[in-house]
C-alpha cells in the first residue's frame, strides 16, 4: 500500500525524507508529499507540500521554494496509493489540522472514519480532503487543545488511537513539540530505525537502510515516541511495551529490502495476500449492511436487475468465473461471464435491468474499458471491481468496489486475484441484501465467515515449502494439466495460466467432467496432473466423481498432485502427492486452493531460471486492444 517515513535528527530533514521516498517508489503510488518542521525546542513552523502524480512533481515544487523554508531537522514523507478519495493534490498526504501545527501521514484504512468525520463536522471542523486520514489529525488536534490531554501531544495521539478501528500505521509531528514524532501501528507494518543521534520510522527498512542497519519492528497495537536521542515503545494506553517489539539487524542490501527479503516481488506479493483480503473487506460491513465504495445505484435499481454479465481479461476473468457461482447461489440471478475482448463484438442482449460487472486490476484495461462503454450505450448498469482508485474504468461506472491490494509489481497477478475474489463475495452479498434473497442475519453470518479467511490464507502460505520442493521435481516436464469441478474449475484455469505466464510451459485447465470428452487422450506416463478437490462435506457427489477422474488418470500412468481439505482421507489412496488445506465452505475454497498453484508456478519458473517478476512478452496493464 502506501509508503511513509518519519525522521528526527541533526541533518536537514528534507533531503533525508526525499531520499527515503525515492527508495520506496518501487511500492507504486499516485501522489506524494512532505512535511517539515523548522524551529527551536519549544516551537516551530510546519511546512507541507504535496502533489499528485510522480515524485518528480513534488521535487519541482520544492525546487522553487526558498531554501530557508525547507530547513528543519524533523520531517514526514509519504507516497500514496489511493483508497479513500481520488489521487489529487488535496487528497495527498501529509494532512494538517486546522491550526496548521500538526501533520500526519498514514498507511491503511480507518474503518470507522465516516462516524468520526460526522462527529467532527458537527463540532465545526471543515475538511479539505476526501480521505479517512484527515479524521485522525483533526481528532488529535481536538484532544491537544482541550480535555484531559490538553497540551500533551503524546497523550492526545494515544487517546485518538484508542478510538480508531481498522488497520493502520499513523505518524504524527507537531510544530509545538518540534523534536518529537509519535507513530503507531495496528496490523499494517511499521519499522523503527536507530541511528547515531537520529531516529527513523518507516513502512519498511528501505526508508532508512542507507543510514542505519539497526531496526525495531513494532508489534500489534504499539506506539513509539521518537526524538533524536532515543525512543519509547508503549501500548495504546501508554504502558511500556518494548518487550513485544522485535529488534533486529538488517543484513539485506537495498534491492533485497525493497522485496522484503524475498528473491522476487511476486513471492513477496503472495505473502501479502492475507493483508490484501483484510483490506478489501475493511469498511464494507457497516450498520449490519454491506456497503460499496462508490454507489450511484439505489437499492430499488439493484432490485430491478434481472441478469448479470461479468466482463474481464486474463486472471481477472478467472475471478469473474468464480463470481458466477457466488452471485447465482446467493441472489438466484443468472450470471454470464465474458472475455471483455469478445463481449462487445457478439452484440450481447443488454437493457436497463442488466448489471455489467467489469473487473480490472489497473482500471485501464482497454478491452474491459470498451466493454464498459458498450454496456453504457445499451443503458445497462455498470459496476467496477478495480485496484486503482481514480482510474478510467471506475470513473465511467455507476458503482465501484475497490480491491485494496495495494501496488502489485510482479506482472503475474497474485494478491490482486485474491482481492478480486473477496470483492466478488462482497458484491454477491450486496445484491442478495438489496434483493432480499438473504436475511440480514444470513448476510452477517456469511460476512463473518469471509472475515475469518485471512488467517487461514496466512496459514496456507506458511505451509507452502513442500509445494516449492514439488515444483522443482517437475520443473522439466513439458506439459502439466489442471483439473477441477465447480469452483475448483476456475482455480484450475488460473493455475494453468500462471504456469504458462511464468514458466513458459504448456499447461491446460479442464473441468474434470470433460476429461472423457477429449483431454484424457493427453494422459501419459509421468504426466503431472494437478487436481483441485472439492470438499466431501460440500458435495459428496462432486467429490465422488472427481475421485473417479483421479483413478482414471492414475491408471494411465499420470502423476497425481491433489489439493484437498484436511481430513479428506478418501483421497489419500489416489494422490501421489497430497497438498492439504484447512476446511472451509465450498464457495470460499478458492481463497485457499489458488495459493499452492501460485507457489508452484513461481517455483517452476525459478527452477527453470526465468525472471518471475517480468515474464517475457507480458505487460502489467494492457492499454491496447
Curated annotation (Swiss-Prot):
GO terms for cellular component: cytosol. It comes from the Bacteria. The keyword Repeat applies. InterPro entries: GATase_2_dom (IPR017932), GFAT (IPR005855), GFAT_N (IPR047084), GlmS/AgaS_SIS (IPR035466), GlmS/FrlB_SIS (IPR035490), Ntn_hydrolases_N (IPR029055), SIS_dom (IPR001347), SIS_dom_sf (IPR046348). It is found in: Cytoplasm. Residues 2-229 form the Glutamine amidotransferase type-2 domain. Its EC number is 2.6.1.16. It catalyses: D-fructose 6-phosphate + L-glutamine = D-glucosamine 6-phosphate + L-glutamate. One of its GO terms (molecular function) is carbohydrate derivative binding. Keywords: Aminotransferase, Cytoplasm, Glutamine amidotransferase, Repeat, Transferase. The active site is at 2 (nucleophile), 620 (for fru-6p isomerization activity). One of its GO terms (biological process) is protein N-linked glycosylation. It holds the Pfam family SIS. Gene3D superfamilies: Glucose-6-phosphate isomerase like protein, domain 1, Glutamine Phosphoribosylpyrophosphate, subunit 1, domain 1. HAMAP family: GlmS. Homodimer. Catalyzes the first step in hexosamine metabolism, converting fructose-6P into glucosamine-6P using glutamine as a nitrogen source. This is Glutamine--fructose-6-phosphate aminotransferase [isomerizing]. The lineage of its organism: Bacteria, Bacillati, Actinomycetota, Actinomycetes, Mycobacteriales.
Amino acid at each position: 500500500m502506501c509508503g511513509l517515513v518519519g525522521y528526527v535528527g541533526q541533518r536537514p530533514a528534507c533531503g533525508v525524507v526525499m531520499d527515503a521516498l525515492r527508495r520506496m517508489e518501487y511500492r507504486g503510488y499516485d501522489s506524494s508529499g512532505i512535511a517539515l518542521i523548522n524551529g527551536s525546542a519549544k516551537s516551530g513552523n510546519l511546512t507541507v507540500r504535496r502533489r499528485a502524480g510522480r515524485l518528480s512533481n513534488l521535487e519541482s515544487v520544492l525546487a522553487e521554494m526558498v531554501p530557508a523554508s525547507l530547513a528543519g531537522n524533523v520531517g514526514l514523507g509519504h507516497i500514496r496509493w489511493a483508497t479513500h478519495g481520488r489521487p489529487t493534490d488535496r487528497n495527498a498526504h501529509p494532512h494538517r489540522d486546522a491550526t496548521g501545527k500538526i501533520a500526519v501521514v498514514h498507511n491503511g484504512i480507518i474503518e470507522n472514519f465516516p462516524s468520526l468525520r460526522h462527529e467532527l463536522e458537527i463540532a465545526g471542523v471543515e475538511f479539505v480532503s476526501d480521505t479517512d486520514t484527515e479524521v485522525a489529525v483533526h481528532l488529535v488536534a481536538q484532544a491537544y487543545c482541550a480535555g484531559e490531554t490538553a497540551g500533551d501531544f503524546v497523550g492526545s495521539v494515544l487517546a485518538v488511537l484508542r478510538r480508531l478501528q481498522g488497520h493502520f500505521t499513523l505518524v504524527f509531528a507537531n510544530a509545538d513539540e518540534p523534536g518529537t514524532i509519535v507513530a503507531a501501528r495496528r496490523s499494517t507494518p511499521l519499522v523503527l530505525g536507530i541511528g547515531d543521534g537520529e531516529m527513523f520510522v518507516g513502512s519498511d527498512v528501505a526508508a532508512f537502510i542507507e543510514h542505519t542497519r539497526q531496526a525495531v519492528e513494532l508489534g500489534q497495537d504499539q506506539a513509539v515516541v521518537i526524538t533524536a536521542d532515543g525512543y519509547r515503545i508503549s501500548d495504546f494506553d501508554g504502558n511500556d511495551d518494548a518487550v513485544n517489539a522485535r529488534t533486529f539487524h538488517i543484513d539485506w542490501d537495498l534491492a533485497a529490502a525493497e522485496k522484503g527479503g524475498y528473491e522476487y516481488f511476486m513471492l513477496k506479493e503472495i505473502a501479502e495476500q492475507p493483508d490484501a483480503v483484510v483490506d478489501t473487506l475493511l469498511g464494507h460491513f457497516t450498520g449490519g449492511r454491506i456497503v460499496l465504495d462508490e454507489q450511484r445505484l439505489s437499492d430499488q435499481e439493484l432490485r430491478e436487475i434481472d441478469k448479470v454479465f461479468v466482463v474481464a481479461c486474463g486472471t481477472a476473468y478467472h475471478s469473474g468465473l468464480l463470481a458466477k457461482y457466488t452471485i447465482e447461489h446467493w441472489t438466484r440471478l443468472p450470471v454470464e461471464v465474458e472475455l471483455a475482448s469478445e463481449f462487445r463484438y457478439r452484440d450481447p442482449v443488454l437493457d436497463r435491468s442488466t448489471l455489467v460487472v467489469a473487473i480490472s486490476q489497473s482500471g485501464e484495461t482497454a478491452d474491459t474499458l470498451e466493454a464498459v462503454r458498450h454496456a453504457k450505450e445499451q443503458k445497462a448498469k455498470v459496476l467496477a471491481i478495480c485496484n486503482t482508485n481514480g482510474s478510467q474504468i471506475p470513473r465511467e461506472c455507476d458503482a465501484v468496489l475497490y480491491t485494496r491490494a495495494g501496488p502489485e509489481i510482479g506482472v503475474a497477478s497474485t494478491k490482486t486475484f485474491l482481492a478480486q475474489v473477496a470483492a466478488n463475495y462482497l458484491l454477491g452479498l450486496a445484491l442478495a441484501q438489496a434483493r432480499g434473497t438473504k436475511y440480514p442475519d444470513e448476510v452477517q453470518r456469511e460476512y463473518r465467515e469471509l472475515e475469518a479467511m485471512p488467517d487461514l490464507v496466512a496459514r496456507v502460505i506458511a505451509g507452502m515449502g513442500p509445494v516449492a520442493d514439488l515444483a522443482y521435481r517437475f520443473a522439466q516436464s513439458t506439459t502439466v494439466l489442471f483439473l477441477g469441478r465447480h469452483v475448483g474449475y476456475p482455480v484450475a484455469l488460473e493455475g494453468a495460466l500462471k504456469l504458462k505466464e511464468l514458466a513458459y510451459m504448456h499447461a491446460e485447465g479442464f473441468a474434470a467432467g470433460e476429461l472423457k470428452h477429449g483431454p484424457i487422450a493427453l494422459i501419459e506416463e509421468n504426466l503431472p496432473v494437478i487436481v483441485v478437490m472439492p470438499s466431501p462435506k460440500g458435495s459428496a457427489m462432486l467429490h465422488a466423481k472427481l475421485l473417479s477422474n483421479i483413478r482414471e488418470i492414475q491408471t494411465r500412468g499420470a502423476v497425481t498432485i491433489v489439493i484437498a481439505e484436511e481430513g479428506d482421507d478418501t483421497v489419500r489412496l489416489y494422490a501421489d502427492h497430497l497438498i492439504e488445506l484447512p476446511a472451509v465452505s465450498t464457495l470460499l475454497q478458492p481463497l485457499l486452493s489458488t495459493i499452492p498453484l501460485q507457489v508452484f508456478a513461481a517455483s517452476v519458473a525459478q527452477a527453470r531460471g526465468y525472471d518471475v517478476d517480468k515474464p517475457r512478452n507480458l505487460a502489467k496493464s494492457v492499454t491496447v486492444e
